[in-house]
Amino acid sequence: VRGGGHSWPGLSVADGGLMIDLALQNSVTVDPARQRASAQGGALLGHLDSATLPQGLVTTAGVVSHTGVGGFTLGGGFGRLNRKFGLAVDNLVAADIVTADGQFRTVSAEQEPDLFWALRGGGGNFGVATRFEFQLHPFDRNVLSGMIVWPVEQAREVLDFYAGWYTGLSDDLYVGPVMLTMPDGTSVIAMEVV
């Protein structure tokens, strides 16, 4: 199943296999009163953000706007807001799927809870997800981000500091270590701060 097509080329499709492409099913609707968003199986994270942000609402999303909502969510969904709001899968409140027997099912904690539980932890192994419904959260502030960079030789010292310091941070702050190779070929360790 191709949602956003963000996977490494060739890793998601078997030679001679069949691909179900959901790219044209990419609409997102927002219900501000219920603080819910509904995204079709081919929607991208950029579509989701574009629909929710003008309403002052967010859910956990990734850092690359052309990632598919489906693959991101069914893979757990780690993003910069996960400390505050949980993983994307934690914010999934319902999904529409077509199972291998051809049945269309809407699953949630109240409706087919076992299948919903499996979907939230087992990825796309239980059917083709055609719609995702997310809990949204008010978010009306400006965000500032940047990177702090050190030579890679200081990686152990930086990571030791990070490990002891990170657990006491506010859930409003995202800090993530990244190893990078700079354009001149030098390696660095960086902390992304949002």
Which residues are covered by each model-predicted region?
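N-terminal glycine-rich flavin-associated loop
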Residues: 1, 22-65, 75-109, 138-160
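C-terminal cap/substrate-recognition region of VAO/PCMH-type FAD-linked oxidoreductases
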Residues: 95-96, 100-194
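Structural motif
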Residues: 17-19, 36-37, 57-60, 71-72, ...
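A generic structural signal for beta-strand entry/edge sites
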Residues: 17, 34-38, 186-190
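Short glycine-biased active-site loop of nucleotidyltransferases that positions the nucleotide triphosphate
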Residues: 8-14, 30, 120
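Flexible loop/turn segments at secondary-structure boundaries
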Residues: 7-9, 46-47, 67-69, 136-137, ...
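Aromatic- and acidic-residue-enriched segments that line the glycan-binding/catalytic groove
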Residues: 10-23, 75, 81, 124
